[in-house]
Amino acid sequence: MPTHAPAPGSGDPLGLHGVVPPVVTAFDADESLDADTTADHARMVVDAGVHGVFPLGTNGEFPLLTPSERDRVVTAVVDEVGGEVPVIAGVGAPSTRQTVAHAEHAASVGADGVVVVTPFYYPLDGTAAVEHYRRVAAAVDCPVYVYHIPSKTGNELSLETLAALAEIDTLAGVKDSSKDVPWLGQAVDAHPELTFLAGSDSLLAPGLDVGCAGLVSAVANVAPELVVGLYEAYDEGDRERARARQSTVYEVRAALKRGPYMAGVKAALGLRGFDAGPLRSPLRGLDDDDRAALEADLADLGLL
């Protein structure tokens, strides 16, 4: 358990903390699912020292997968690294019915917890959001974590709604990607029973400063050793070294943002010797110029 870094929530049975990458979903050249390589990526980051894995987050391209493909991803990752670190599986969908189905499957194959993104496309009020999470929590016998990313879902959770969600017995934490530091700080202060996970590479060390126990980092998909080093420095009480690592994370994050949305992570993995295949359409990869620039950036940062 952490020494100087924030502790997980008192009501979190998994005690989630540390670095929890939102692992990638690998595809073959024709964009068909490559479950084996998906599992290999989870293995890669676990062997690098991360503290948990989160399949089927944004980096896992979950909205672009069929329901059966999503189930295969969770099974593959649990089979590969389950029992070594917590596996918290993304199960969110626009409908409560589909979310429950994904959650039931994840729990049945051994996922340690489920991550439920707020439903998207249709706007929801707080009452609907709370009922959604209640129904998911009632369907599975494992902890449930809220994934709060209003920039993608269009649905922001108020602090009042979060307070109502916290009354759900098995709701154990929040992965916050809102980048709203005042909201996050107030949420952490109000709910010591919940584990909070900082969900943006722009706010890893700052997230720890406001009380987040864990870090869900896209950069950790590419350079897990960098983000693990940041967390370990912080937990050892070496804030100066942790902030220096955060500065490097900022530079890596900027490099990964070259070109089309989310193309940088898989391209960087390929440059570092791990081929996760293409993004699934309509997402597209880097062109030759952007790939060359990314390669130069990573080399300058000592990652190649």
Curated annotation (Swiss-Prot):
It holds the Pfam family DHDPS. The active site is at 58 (charge relay system), 121 (charge relay system), 147 (proton donor), 175 (schiff-base intermediate with substrate). It comes from the Archaea. It is found in: Cytoplasm. One of its GO terms (biological process) is small molecule metabolic process. Its main location: cytoplasm. GO terms for molecular function: 2-dehydro-3-deoxy-phosphogluconate aldolase activity; 4-hydroxy-tetrahydrodipicolinate synthase activity. GO terms for cellular component: cytoplasm. Keywords: Cytoplasm, Lyase, Schiff base. Its EC number is 4.-.-.-. The keyword Lyase applies. Belongs to the DapA family. Homotetramer. PANTHER family: 4-HYDROXY-2-OXOGLUTARATE ALDOLASE, MITOCHONDRIAL, DIHYDRODIPICOLINATE SYNTHASE. This is Uncharacterized DapA-like lyase VNG_0444G. It comes from Halobacterium salinarum (strain ATCC 700922 / JCM 11081 / NRC-1) (Halobacterium halobium).
